[in-house]
Amino acid sequence: MDEKELKQILATKAPAYQRSLIEIPKDSFVTWHSSLTDYLDSVLGDSPKMQNRIDHLVMRYRLGATDEVKGEHYGTVLPRINRNGMIVGGNVIHFNVDDGSILNHDALVNHLYSWYAFDYYVDPNVFFGEHLLYGRLAVVVQEEKTALLGTLAYPDIEWLAVGVGNNLTDEMMKKLIGRQIVLYPDDFCVDFWSEHFGGKFKVDDSFTHCDINQYLIDFIHSRQVP
């Protein structure tokens, strides 16, 4: 073992306040199909056009898969990527392929000790989908799955997700000032989003008592989105 390898291993043992911030390499995550893409296939159909759109979604969001199987399906790697193209966090989620519910959820960084022998750079104030943010019109939702369905249903709107298990922060919303933004909270975060961000941004509570994911799926089918 050389000095560099020893330093990398020791870095994973250091207290959090002593760790250096090192970028997770872009080529460390290979896009692949998983329980989430299997779910999308099951609810949206397997027509060639839809399959191509889902494949394109996998590449744009750099969705990956773990080799850990639950319910006969691979876990989904949902990386958060900043505007510089750096992977700065994310989630690893196993989805129920039949209904899209979450079977198991874990933060991406919790897997890094077993995947890498070096420390990592994490920024909790980055949206899922932020690396694709270029226009002025954007929607903010809680779950990554919702943002992906929204992109398929309304491709002209940029969809951002806070991420399962994460909270919307002032730092995240500061980056959206000057854009046309609509926040669609679920029933768990509607009070906080409305009270904390309602003064500067539009908060629409239309989906606090109905399933936004099912709405998007129905919209795709009804409009026959290609």
Segments from the language model and where they lie:
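TOPRIM metal-binding catalytic domain and adjacent DNA-binding surface shared by DnaG-type primases
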Residues: M1-N84, L132, I220-P226
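Serine/threonine-rich low-complexity intrinsically disordered regions
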Residues: D2, A14, S20, P25, ...
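Extended hydrophobic/Leu-rich segments
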Residues: L6-L10, M50, I54-L57, I102-L112, ...
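A generic structural micro-environment signature
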Residues: T12, A16, V30, D98-D99, ...
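Sequence-level detector for tyrosine residue identity
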Residues: Y17, Y39, Y61, Y74, ...
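Generic hydrophobic/packing signal
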Residues: V30, L36-T37, L44-D46, R53-R60, ...
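Phosphate-handling DNA/RNA-contact segment within nucleic-acid enzymes
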Residues: E68-I177
